[in-house]
């Protein structure tokens, strides 16, 4: 039996907490396919729940599952392995980065081996989900307070968005690209707004990193997500002299904003954009959970430091 709470996830699990990756799940069918290469026990990939009948990667983030009284909401697809992942060292691959998913607990309760798992119908009008990334060398070193990021969060919240993540990064293209890919592909947020790094100095790399991860260019959105306002209205916005990019990666719109609070305030207002909503078939389905696992180790997961649920 496992006990789950919204505040922590799985009680006694070392990776629990008030965050979006409280519970990890893997499809039983994916594990069986991997076993044709090498035998692994349930829990070897660090998963908490092994479930039959679901191809999790084909489901959109925010999918909700009912297991008895427990309700889980899928929050992320995949996660890169740690450098000391034993399975990856032995076989050259691990299925968790591409097949594993994570969820938060919306409603707590008990889970038992063999409980039925139901995919719940999607919400009729879910809020749009966003992330905010501030690019600043000095800010990342603690030498300057980030004022633009919180301002953007305030604007997004006022417009009805749910801000899933905020982060402060140095002006490094590699780090920015990695986070843009993770937020767009793994977390599937509707909108990513970056602030900073759009000027003309050698360290201003935000547009280049943004274009590098893009599937399509979306220049019209530089006049505001959904094109609701224009930057050309007087008085001139402090952010006009900018190399900012606006692109699409999958179903995620990525828009670069200037770095200063004044320039951010001079940008177009953010409005909810219905076209950002994913339209995916979402049918009610049920599966059967095979075996729960509780990760009891405080460090990266190893097959040797996992414990089966009692």
Can you annotate each of these PLM segments?
Residues 113-116, 120-310:
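Non-catalytic beta/alpha edge segments that cap or flank active sites
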Residues 79-95, 296-308:
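Cysteine-cluster motifs in flexible loop/terminal segments that predominantly coordinate metals
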Residues 37-39, 62-63, 91, 106-107, ...:
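A generic local secondary-structure boundary/capping motif
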Residues 96-119:
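Compact mixed alphabeta submodule
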Residues 38-48, 85-100:
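Short, basic/aromatic beta-hairpin or loop at an interaction surface
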């Amino acid at each position: 039996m496992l006990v789950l709470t919204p505040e922590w996830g799985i009680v006694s699990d070392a990776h629990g907490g008030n965050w979006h990756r409280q519970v990890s799940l893997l499809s039983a069918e994916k594990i069986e396919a991997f076993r044709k290469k090498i035998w692994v026990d349930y829990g070897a990939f660090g998963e908490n729940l092994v479930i039959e009948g679901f191809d999790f990667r084909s489901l959109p983030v925010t999918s909700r599952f009912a297991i008895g009284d427990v309700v889980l909401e899928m929050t992320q697809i995949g996660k890169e392995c740690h450098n000391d992942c034993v399975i990856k060292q032995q076989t050259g691959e691990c299925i968790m980065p591409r097949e594993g998913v994570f969820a938060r607990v919306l409603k707590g309760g008990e889970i038992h081996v063999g409980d039925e798992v139901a995919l719940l119908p999607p919400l009729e009008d879910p809020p749009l989900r966003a992330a905010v990334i501030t690019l600043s060398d000095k800010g990342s070193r603690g030498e300057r307070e980030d004022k633009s990021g919180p301002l953007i969060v305030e604007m997004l919240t006022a417009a009805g968005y749910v801000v899933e993540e905020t982060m402060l990064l140095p002006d490094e293209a590699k780090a920015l690209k990695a986070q843009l890919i993770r937020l767009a592909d793994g977390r599937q947020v509707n909108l990513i707004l970056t602030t900073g790094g759009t000027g003309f100095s050698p360290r201003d790399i935000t547009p280049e990193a943004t274009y590098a991860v893009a599937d399509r260019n979306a220049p019209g959105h530089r006049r505001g997500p959904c094109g609701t306002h224009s930057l050309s209205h007087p008085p001139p916005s402090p952010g006009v002299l900018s190399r900012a990019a606006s692109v699409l990666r999958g179903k995620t719109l990525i828009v670069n904003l200037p770095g200063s609070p004044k320039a951010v305030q001079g940008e177009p207002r953010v409005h909810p954009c219905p076209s950002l909503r994913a339209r995916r078939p979402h049918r009610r389905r049920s599966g059967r959970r095979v075996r729960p696992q509780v990760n009891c180790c405080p460090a990266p997961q190893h097959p040797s430091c996992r414990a089966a649920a009692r």
